[in-house]
Amino acid sequence: MKMTRRAFVKANAAASAAAVAGITLPASAANLIVSSDETKIKWDKAPCRFCGTGCSVLVGTQNGRVVATQGDPEAPVNKGLNCIKGYFLSKIMYGKDRLQTPMLRMKNGEYNKEGDFAPVSWDQAFDVMAEKFKKALKEKGPTSVGMFGSGQWTVMEGYAASKMMKAGFRSNNIDPNARHCMASAVGGFMRTFGIDEPMGCYDDFEHADSFVLWGSNMAEMHPVLWTRITDRRLSHPHVKVNVLSTYYHRSFELADNGMIFEPQTDLAIANFIANYIIQNDAVNWDFVTKHTHFKRAETDIGYGLRDDNPLQMKAKHPNSGALHPMDFEQYKASVAEYTVEKASQMSGVSEEKLIEMAKQYADPKVKVMSLWTMGMNQHTRGVWMNSLVYNIHLLTGKISQPGNSPFSLTGQPSACGTAREVGTFSHRLPADMVVANPKHRAIAEKIWKLPDGTIPAKPGYHAVQQDRMLKDGKLNAYWVMCNNNMQAGPNINEERLPGYRNPENFIVCSDPYPTVTAQASDLILPTAMWVEKEGAYGNAERRTQAWYQQVKSQGDSKSDLWQLMEFSKRFKIEEVWGEDLLAQMPEYRGKTMYEVLFRNGQVDKFPLSEAQELNDDAKAQGFYLQKGLFEEYAAFGRGHGHDLAPYDVYHQVRGLRWPVVDGKETLWRFVEGSDPYVPEGEGFRFYGKPDGKANIIFAPFEPAPEEPDQEYDMWLCTGRVLEHWHTGTMTRRVPELYKAVPDALCFIHPDDAQKRGLRRGDEVLLESRRGEVRCRVETRGRNRPPVGLVFVPFFDARVLVNKLILDATDPLSKQTDYKKCPIKITKV
């Protein structure tokens, strides 16, 4: 779809006039298309490059550059709106320090790990890179090579990377940065329902009577979705908004019931609500009897630390995800100890506020939408917390219906579509399959035309484990793509930087800008961004969206997909597979990894003539690469509850929510009449489980691995702010966003500041047991922590706050807890 600037002026004028008159124009009337010769600006659609909301924008290009963006009025997600970051999308690709050519550490004309970065050709870059990967493979085998990817990869990039690692190099050591943000959500879905991703959709916002935010500052992190909650709340007086957080933020401004709780005690609060439902006879027995089982989680499971860490050694059942059967009476007895008095005493939230929220869940006439993001997922018991909230919805039957929706929000544009659905985690394959399951491996090997036994059965190193293995010298050739983990990951000083600078290791970073990660690497590959390539993303409501390339990449930068294709050409299949595999398929002898994986009659099935004129990746390979990868990937899910539409369809629509069966998207899963996989007469079927029943899982309160003491007497919570996204790689290069919020500040309660002799603007030293950073004090403003806690965002490369964070994870999901870390604060 192409539009001119004049079309936008007309559309906006018409829409404004209609609004004044109190009428609504159809989308087609507000999105006129006129002849492109009336202006040189061309317009086309693309999903936003930032968060997991999945807003659609209209991209204006002129003279080979993106010159403007605007909210897409035809998009059902954002309905023409953008947040402040979205309005400046046109500037993210044009930072003054945009990387234009590969850079290799050199000394005396050769690669040297202690050398300075010097520009090299792509051939030279890949020559050195291939040499290092081949050396590691030959000396230590497939487990010595790895990749750290991204929820910002396109679907096709993630699919190609996962296929290259797991089928080509035969290494499961690939993990996305979504491990840091969504792994606990995945774990909760799989344990409770046996299948990943939300059963509801954004339409729930217009149907709910009550909203409960469990650790999610939607006003800043998902602002477009927050406008829908705001509209619902202000337009319907009966609607209530409940906000749970460890500190006061902008979402509290709309809250009818705002609750500040002690870190980690959300576990007790969730169990109290379940107890309240039972004690007040609010259990939906018809639903519970037909559609659920009761289970008990194994307890005292540790904190995902190194095996020799004293905290880990104390655990009775380290890393255990075992579930034990129980009946309702046993479940009732288990939650009974979580009375309102106990929950209030533990959490610091008043009994009145807890009961007010619990009543909304218990009332069968009130439709409740629970929403959460990192506050629940970045948690050493994040999987438990996800399941505890599902328990509440399952006990009341408030699930898979308009307005009744437990909804896990995502933070990255394709954490769902790429990391989760494609399966770029170290333990996963596409469509919720896992490498540990021999039947799943056999399916993947058949689709990929591989010999039996190609895919290793053992899960690879997850994100935090990759850092540890780099440091220990067991992971030696490592490719970081589309993320800035040196700034975003935990425990930078002790566990990450030592591995990058380990002389045994060779670290590659693909990025558009010289990030902290790039500067710590040995080879930097300049990467094409966003609409400089064709791609597809999958958002938080299961909506897959595609876009065409609209401008050429800058300098000699290349897309991640191009880099994967070209690198795979550097390996003969004999260099990565053993004789046992080659003997099964001798026709592969002498071929490159590229030919075996990507010229297999499926990926290269669609001719270049089907691609748009501007598609550099397709032209480089001589076939419609993106379509071939997408269609091969889609074969995993079609007929198995993960159905995707044909690739070309996505370019004609503003996304479709899977499963897409017979051309129809699915709004609510697991419910008859909406989900084609639920048989007639069953009402509900949670078909991720063999018997179609979901698990109600009891898990108790367990403390955080570290808590404040006399020396480290404050909690530290990290996170984001409205104006910046993650580590600020893109947003800090947008002048307007940088000027709005140039620095990461230490938000602190005035009483804590006064106690330490601090005033607003003072520079302070924040110290944990792992490191220290300096920043300035803020006692006013949007974020207002309670006494005993500070909030510091992580977007600022000059304030590497994650140096302070313990690399403790949820032992089940392996996701890091960034929300609670003891520190001390002193004035500089």
From Swiss-Prot:
Annotated localization: Periplasm
Residues reported in the UniProt entry to bind substrate: 794
Keyword flag Iron-sulfur: yes
Description of post-translational modifications: Predicted to be exported by the Tat system. The position of the signal peptide cleavage has not been experimentally proven.
GO cellular component: membrane; nitrate reductase complex; periplasmic space
Binding, [4Fe-4S] cluster: 48, 51, 55, 83
EC number of the protein: 1.9.6.1
Cross-referenced InterPro entries: Asp_de-COase-like_dom_sf, CT_Nitrate-R-NapA-like, MoPterin_dinucl-bd_dom, Mopterin_OxRdtase, Mopterin_OxRdtase_4Fe-4S_dom, MopterinOxRdtase_cofactor_BS, Periplasm_NO3_reductase_lsu, Prok_molybdopt-oxidoreductase
Keywords: 4Fe-4S, Electron transport, Iron, Iron-sulfur, Metal-binding, Molybdenum, Nitrate assimilation, Oxidoreductase, Periplasm, Signal, Transport
Signal peptide: 1-30
Swiss-Prot/TrEMBL catalytic activity: 2 Fe(II)-[cytochrome] + nitrate + 2 H(+) = 2 Fe(III)-[cytochrome] + nitrite + H2O
GO terms (BP aspect): cellular respiration; Mo-molybdopterin cofactor biosynthetic process; nitrate assimilation
Family statement: Belongs to the prokaryotic molybdopterin-containing oxidoreductase family. NasA/NapA/NarB subfamily.
Role played: Catalytic subunit of the periplasmic nitrate reductase complex NapAB. Receives electrons from NapB and catalyzes the reduction of nitrate to nitrite.
Name of the protein: Periplasmic nitrate reductase 1
Encoding gene per record: napA1
